[in-house]
């Protein structure tokens, strides 16, 4: 398995403070030289424009728009990981919502799909022991498709999530 991963066409660039222009240039180069199947930006709030801006919210909005244009230009899906604001902390129901996307309402507008991760057992004072070891993928936006919640198993010691085991005896 490790041999397959070593030979896989995966390119990781963990350069700090990448600008949108640098990301666009690298995406074009990789597509031309190796082919490109997916772009992942981890995470959006670490991006910088390299210039003075009026507000961070405007800057993040511009990144959101530029990433959408980049995905269309290079014709591949683009996943942009984003932090949430502290909205859930002030609510009784701690489940994240679209409005909790940090620093920009345009993230919600530009995205074709928004998935939020929620771990009920990670909340202080969690009483939902029946859900221990589970998490939810909340499909909060899906342009042209259904929205809803998908329960999954958390396997945090392996830094992964998996399908829940199904009961074939019911």
Residue ranges of model-derived segments:
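Conserved inter-motif catalytic segment of the P-loop NTP-binding fold
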Residues: 1-55, 62, 89-90
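C-terminal regions of RecA-like/P-loop NTPase motor modules
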Residues: 20-38, 65-75, 86-170
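Alpha-helix N-cap and loop-to-helix initiation/capping positions
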Residues: 54-59, 96-99
